[in-house]
From Swiss-Prot:
Belongs to the bacterial histone-like protein family. NCBIfam families: himA, PRK00285.1. It comes from the Bacteria. The keyword DNA-binding applies. PROSITE patterns: HISTONE_LIKE. Signal peptide: none annotated. This is Integration host factor subunit alpha. The lineage of its organism: Bacteria, Pseudomonadati, Pseudomonadota, Alphaproteobacteria, Hyphomicrobiales. GO terms for cellular component: cytosol. It comes from Chelativorans sp. (strain BNC1). Heterodimer of an alpha and a beta chain. The keyword Aminoacyl-tRNA synthetase does not apply. The gene is ihfA. InterPro entries: Hist_DNA-bd, Histone-like_DNA-bd_CS, IHF-like_DNA-bd_dom_sf, IHF_alpha. GO terms for molecular function: DNA binding; structural constituent of chromatin.
Amino acid sequence: MGGKTVTRADLAEAVYRKVGLSRTESAQIVEMVLQEVCDAIVRGETVKLSSFATFQVREKNERVGRNPKTGEEVPISPRRVMTFKASNVLKSRILRAHQTRKPSKEATASS
């Protein structure tokens, strides 16, 4: 499952190759898009990228948790968390890609 990690530089290179802008312009566009997404999330806005995903900031109330070692109750402060929800289109693409992979050695050995 581990595969390659895609970086900002990889995204800029893809824009450069596919759109035909200079490498500098491509890197600037990637930076600007990521900055806009980050700024909107920091402002507490929901960012919905159609056919990709939704990023949303949620408020979590204060609650009581437990220390798993001791069982002692520990207060957990209220906080804001960001959630990422993949779109159905992205989920379908991931599922199709998974289904078209070669079967593993374990799967073929048990057949």
